[in-house]
Amino acid sequence: MRLTPEMVDVERLVGAVREPGTIDIVGDTFAIVQPFTRVPWLEAILGNPVEALIQGGSMRTHRFVDGWEDWHGVTAHRQDAWFRLLMQITELLVERSGGRAATVAPILRGPSDLAEAVLGPELMIYSLYDHPDRMRRFLDEVTDLFTEVHNGLLRRFAPVAGGTVSYFGIWAPGTVVRTQCDASAFLSAKLYRDWFVAYDLRTCEGADTSIIHLHSCSMHTVDALLETPLPHAIQVILEEGPNVPTLRAL
């Protein structure tokens, strides 16, 4: 089912008003609330069709650019209805939290992820060689959008003890940004270094503390990231799978 902004039940997503109080603690982290994170917000704002899979409870985007003429043929590369919806939900979450939970940004995918979502992996990779100027303009545009959306969220968050709580429930002084580069899984270390690390760093510059999310299949990006002062932290998900003896038995 194709999801559009007017189909979203805002009241159901933000929940009831909570009694005011101090922020709750969950284990070693602060309690958080966030705009429904299954919605691929940045991709939707860029114009990606969003498909809601009712039985699986997930949402996916579909690339909508088969060639660069499709991208340049679009008058506006920002869907204001999705942008306004994200900001509205964020404001309501802050208002209704009662200070009991920190409102944080949903998953915001980084420039390489946005390139893969809009262009698809084939056009994305070929364009690094065949259309480098167009690709750089595209990456400039989506990186600027990332920063614009994140700044809009930061302006709406309520500070916690003079700082901000991250997506991971961890407090930091000042402001925090979380970015990611999952699409680096199909990039070589050289392509990531030559093309994408600079754009990831630009997303990190939008806050006082920056975190980048990786999967274990993207560890080849770490050397390039460690050569720069940003991000301040690298968060890695270690994918689990069969051990070597099990694989041999198969």
Model-predicted regions and their roles:
Residues 54-91:
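A gly/proline- and charged-residue-enriched helix-loop-helix capping module
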Residues 47-54:
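Conserved oxyanion/phosphate-binding beta-strand-loop segments in alpha/beta enzyme cores
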Residues 6-9:
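Outer-membrane beta-barrel proteins
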Residues 1-2, 12-36, 41-47, 76-250:
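Active-site loop segments of alpha/beta catalytic cores
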